[in-house]
């Protein structure tokens, strides 16, 4: 009898272990501090919630690389996938197959088309982030007829193109004399980004500002201005404080923005855990995230989408941050 009970206990233990939820957290690519920080937040939340979180991504930002990872995670039996998409539609076939197999699919940082996921963990609406970019630049640019360049990762990435579209609309409305002289891309490559930034500065010797809403492009733009001794150019955009700290301390960058990407990773895993344990989240529902607070599910329309469906929506981060010399040492990510 004791032997049977022991065997039963072992069997139940194995079944319990097999039933533990596994969540895949996928960046656009590995080796970039921004994404690593998001992954750290995701893994930290996994430990708090008792779920297994795996952080992995392609070495280059490509649809094929992300699709391969998605398919691998599905085949390995992962229960949820959270991905920062390199393309709004390129991942959709793989993600829809995953959902058909019962896998919960969420996006973070950069969205797919909304029908290809359930919830998007969004750092801010395009209007919020596009407006922030222009506001940071306008506080430094004094010339009414300023010349401005946009510089970010690629012409196809969802999030950054939405922000830039809104930023350009705000410039047209509020700073009609500004001239957007060029829009160029670094393709998430540090070397190419530096070369591109230097090329912009050389091509436009009277440039007043570079707006770089990308974790590789912003430090590259700052480094390029130092290399070419172009002190009069305002450099603004989005990146992590640990990457930008030296440029802020040297005065090359006066202000840049971001959101707490560690917090974003935590929120994403908490939302995925809710979907796995408690079921779908609909617009108007809330998720209580330990240490952050209660976050509401918003309609897809806050991102400019027309698609709405049951179990589908957007969770916005509670705030965005502008980093300056005065506050940057309060942050470590």
Curated annotation (Swiss-Prot):
TM region positions: none
First and last residue of the signal peptide: 1-19
One Pfam family hit: Peripla_BP_4
Keyword Signal in annotation: yes
Gene Ontology terms: cellular component: ATP-binding cassette (ABC) transporter complex; outer membrane-bounded periplasmic space
UniProt KW Ligase keyword: no
PANTHER family: ABC TRANSPORTER PERIPLASMIC-BINDING PROTEIN YPHF, D-XYLOSE-BINDING PERIPLASMIC PROTEIN
Role, per record: Part of the ABC transporter complex LsrABCD involved in autoinducer 2 (AI-2) import. Binds AI-2 and delivers it to the LsrC and LsrD permeases.
Family, per entry: Belongs to the bacterial solute-binding protein 2 family.
NCBIfam families tied to this protein: PRK15408.1
Protein known as: Autoinducer 2-binding protein LsrB
Species: Enterobacter sp. (strain 638)
Taxonomic path: Bacteria, Pseudomonadati, Pseudomonadota, Gammaproteobacteria, Enterobacterales
Gene this chain is encoded by: lsrB
């Amino acid at each position: 009898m004791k032997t049977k009970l022991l065997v039963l206990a072992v069997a139940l233990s194995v079944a319990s272990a097999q039933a533990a939820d596994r969540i895949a957290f996928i960046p656009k690519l590995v080796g970039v501090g921004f994404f690593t920080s998001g992954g750290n937040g995701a893994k930290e939340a996994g430990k708090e919630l008792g779920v297994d979180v795996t952080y992995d991504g392609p070495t280059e930002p490509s649809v094929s690389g992300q699709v391969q990872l998605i398919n691998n995670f599905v085949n390995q039996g992962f229960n949820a996938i959270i991905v920062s998409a390199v393309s709004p539609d390129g991942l959709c076939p793989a993600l829809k197959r995953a959902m058909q197999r019962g896998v919960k699919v969420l996006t973070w940082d950069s969205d797919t088309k909304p029908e290809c996921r359930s919830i998007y963990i969004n750092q801010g609406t395009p209007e919020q982030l596009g407006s922030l970019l222009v506001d940071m630049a306008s506080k430094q640019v004094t010339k009414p007829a300023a010349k401005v360049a946009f510089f970010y990762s690629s012409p196809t990435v969802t999030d950054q193109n939405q922000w830039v579209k809104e930023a350009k609309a705000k410039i047209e409305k509020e700073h009609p004399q500004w001239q957007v002289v060029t829009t160029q891309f670094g393709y998430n490559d540090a070397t190419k980004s530096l070369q591109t930034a230097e090329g912009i500065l050389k091509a436009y010797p009277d440039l007043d500002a570079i707006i770089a809403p990308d974790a590789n492009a912003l430090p590259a733009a700052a480094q390029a201005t130092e290399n070419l001794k172009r002190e009069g150019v305002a450099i603004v955009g989005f990146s992590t404080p640990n990457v930008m700290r030296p440029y802020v301390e040297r005065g090359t960058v006066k202000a840049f923005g971001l959101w707490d990407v560690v917090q974003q990773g935590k929120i994403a895993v908490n939302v995925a855990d809710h979907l796995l344990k408690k079921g779908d989240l609909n617009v108007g529902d809330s998720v209580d995230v330990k240490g952050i607070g209660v976050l509401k599910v918003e309609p897809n329309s806050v991102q400019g989408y027309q698609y709405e469906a049951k179990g589908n929506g957007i969770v916005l981060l509670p705030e965005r941050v502008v980093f300056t010399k005065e506050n940057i040492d309060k942050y470590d990510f």
